[in-house]
Amino acid sequence: SLTEDELLRLRSLGSDAASAVGRAIENISAGQSEIEIAEEMRHELAAGKMASVVTLVAADERIAGYRHPVPTENRWNKTLLLVTCAKRGGLIVSLSRIVCIGEPSDELKRKTESAAYVNACLLNATRPGATGAKLYKTAADAYAEQGFAGEIDHHHQGGAAGYKTREWVAHPQSGEVVRSGQAF
């Protein structure tokens, strides 16, 4: 669990990281490479005294192909995924953003709505006393309800946040217990 001061600092870090990534998005344009976009994101985070301990970027077709897309020379044309784990004062927050030039595809809209549903189910289930295994099952059931049964097997579903990118990760046998004062 985190102290009240740590929770306040974590919230501030989350807000500042989101703003920095937003500024990076304003500064990039189609045609740039994933590497150039990653550099811009790291630059904006550094301006806010944050370090990106994880920087992932995928453009267009690479989004569907890689769960942890290390930036390449691939150039952005329409759709972009940006991911960071931003660190300041020892604490780490994780965030992802999708950017589209023009109207997003119907498929992307559907996947975004489904991901939001899964996230809402997890937020609702993340209460003191819940186990990581219960949260994993909640996510698996929510994916299935949205027509994405088995999607949970393609990537970890996250877990408690704090001084590591994940203090623990939810999985089917996860015995970790959600405690008051933890961040997710």
Regions found by a protein language model. Name each.
Residues S1-F184:
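Active-site neighborhoods and metal-handling regions in enzymes and metal-associated proteins
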